[in-house]
Amino acid sequence: MTKDNNNNPRYLAVKTLERISDGAYSNLQINNVIDSTKMSEKDTRLFTNIVYGVIQHRLTFEYYVSKLVKHPGKLQNWVKELLYTAIYQMIYLDKVPNRAIFDESIKIAKFRGHDGIRRLVTGVLHKIDRDGLPQITGVNAIEKQSIEASVPVWIIKQLNNQVGKAKTESILKSINQPANQSIRINIKKIEKKALVKELERIGFTVRDSEVAADALVLKDGVAAHTALFKEGFYTIQDESAMLPVQSMDIDGDDYILDTCAAPGGKTTQIAEHLTTGLVVALDLHENKLHKIMENAERMGVSENVDMVSVIICSLVL
């Protein structure tokens, strides 16, 4: 396994999840891994699926591991992430046989840890295979909802107060449905019809978004791993995240402040509508501001973007 680690989707998923749990942006980490490795298209999809799947179901998996391991608080972070990735595959990836999940997970445990960790991982996986996942018991109704839907308790309480218990239950049932792979067309660089043609030419299945005007929904490929993306003809953004800017009546000479701007999806979206105007991106972390400018340069809108650190702003004030 050692010689293939740099292109092993499961091994890379564990490492990526470690970085994300330490505060890194998930999309940036995923894109960095894809760009810096030589994974096949199939392995890239598996890697992306596992990382986003664990993020999506993290609270649920944390509960399971807390019941399957005697002292879960003593586990190293990478061991937790390894167990989460294995559990995700066992539950949600029907086409992957358990023997393959077990074999790969145990190899990673053996490579990264000592024999005790290998035995622990082996024991946990075989226990799940033999007895199934732990039942959710000993918690109140809201805590049970939180674990099942992987949504923090405080959010469920807020939803209950704002929209009522019935609507909250409906939201929680739908919240973990697989998200669309959506992109936002760079209207300064290309027309929708031309972009659709190019995407279909390189193998994507493309449809119009039902949510946002400048969005497309893609299947059968990885949107962040194309020359079209690198050349700034589109950016990756959730459909609903495009709506705030879409609702703005932006004039080309407007000056607009985007607070808490990172990672910059809305900043570049605003800039695409500007000619002589300017959008000022404000964020607490300077390294995140640099990433915004990288995206603005890729999208060809950097002349309409300026960046200000919150720290600098507070010193001036």
Predicted features along the sequence, with ranges:
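S-adenosylmethionine
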Residues: 1-317
